[in-house]
């Protein structure tokens, strides 16, 4: 038997049954059928359980009256605090726990929906490429803020069923604005805090070939969901530059727009941000111009 019952009213059959249930659930989480196989750490928070609970990692009883263990707020996994240090990065978020699309961790969102990229990115880019590639000042011209907020609320409310068609939003700048807002609202930027400094250092390399190689090496450090989303965005932005005659947007212009959107320094420093802006622009410009080589 895997545990000893803490109270007389719980017989050994009940205890064993609960333990087996925990182990089955743990196995299901470990061997989930997520085709894209993105790793995600659990988002554990101290939790007070009502009634008897067993750790879903070690299968032992969680003793105490308050704060007996921790629960993952994304998938609901319950474990001892000390066991949480050993749980693998196999969080499979439950859609019921994902309350919104914007401001949600990117990997959490794609794992919950079992998609390669956030649906916002796919849907907005499809709409922009269908009717906006020749629009002058694409991504540089801003749409009405309240309409952009409407699109955000539509995605948060309706998910992939959100209607952003020309019938509802004829101004394509509203859709580009909603896409940029999604990237700005990410708690961890597309180009993560962990890789930010390395990208900036790569941008400072004077030799073009060495700089490209350095950028490629740092790209490999991005989490898979971030890498895939960035790759898809750069392919799209390359298409935007191919219509420069009409939209007047080249890779440098897009770098100015997307640099601060995709890259944020780990420390919230105005001086750092101002100092790094030219390197942020350059990184995005390099990614666009060399997307076929870098990705």
From Swiss-Prot:
* GO-annotated biological processes: acrosome assembly; signal transduction
What does the entry report regarding how activity is regulated?
In the inactive state, the N terminus protrudes into the active site of the Rho-GAP domain, sterically blocking Rac binding. Phospholipid binding to the Phorbol-ester/DAG-type zinc-finger/C1 domain triggers the cooperative dissociation of these interactions, allowing the N-terminus to move out of the active site and thereby activating the enzyme.
Single GO MF annotation: GTPase activator activity
The UniProt keyword set, sorted, is: GTPase activation, Membrane, Metal-binding, SH2 domain, Zinc, Zinc-finger
Which tissue types show expression of this protein? Found in cerebellum and testis.
Q: Does the keyword Membrane apply?
A: yes
What GO CC annotations are associated with the protein? membrane; synapse
The UniProt entry lists membrane topology as: Peripheral membrane protein
Q: Which organism is it from?
A: Rattus norvegicus (Rat)
Q: What does this protein do?
A: GTPase-activating protein for p21-rac.
Superkingdom assignment: Eukaryota
User: Pfam families per the record?
Assistant: C1_1 (PF00130), RhoGAP (PF00620)
List the protein's name.
Beta-chimaerin
Q: Where is this site: Arginine finger?
A: 140
Which residue numbers delimit the Phorbol-ester/DAG-type Zn fingers? 41-91
The gene name on file is Chn2
Keyword Transmembrane appears in the UniProt entry? no
């Amino acid at each position: 038997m895997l545990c000893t019952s803490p109270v007389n009213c719980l017989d050994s059959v009940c205890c064993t049954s609960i333990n087996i249930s925990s182990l089955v659930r743990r196995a299901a989480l470990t061997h989930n059928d997520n085709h894209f196989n993105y790793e995600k750490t659990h988002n554990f928070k101290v939790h007070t359980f009502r009634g008897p609970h067993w750790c879903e990692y070690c299968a032992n009883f969680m003793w105490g009256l308050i704060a007996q263990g921790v629960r993952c707020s994304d998938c609901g996994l319950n474990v001892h605090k000390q066991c949480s240090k050993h749980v693998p990065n196999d969080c499979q978020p439950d859609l019921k726990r994902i309350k919104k699309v914007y401001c949600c961790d990117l990997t959490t969102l794609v794992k919950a929906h079992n998609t390669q990229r956030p649906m916002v990115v796919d849907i907005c880019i499809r709409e922009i490429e269908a009717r906006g590639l020749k629009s002058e000042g694409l991504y540089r011209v801003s749409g009405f803020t309240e309409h952009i907020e409407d699109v955000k609320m539509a995605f948060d409310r309706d998910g992939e069923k959100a209607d952003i068609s020309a019938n509802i939003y004829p101004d394509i700048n509203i859709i580009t604005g909603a896409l940029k807002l999604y990237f700005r609202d990410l708690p961890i930027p597309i180009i993560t805090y962990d890789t930010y400094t390395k990208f900036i250092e790569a941008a400072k390399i004077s030799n073009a070939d060495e700089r490209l190689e350095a950028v490629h090496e740092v790209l490999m450090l991005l989490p898979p969901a971030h890498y895939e989303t960035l790759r898809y965005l750069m392919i799209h932005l390359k298409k935007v530059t191919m219509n420069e005659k009409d939209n007047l947007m080249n890779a440098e212009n897009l770098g100015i727009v997307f640099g601060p959107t995709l890259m944020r320094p780990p420390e919230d420093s105005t001086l750092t941000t101002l100092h790094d802006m030219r390197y942020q622009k350059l990184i995005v410009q390099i990614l666009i111009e060399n997307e076929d080589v870098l990705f």
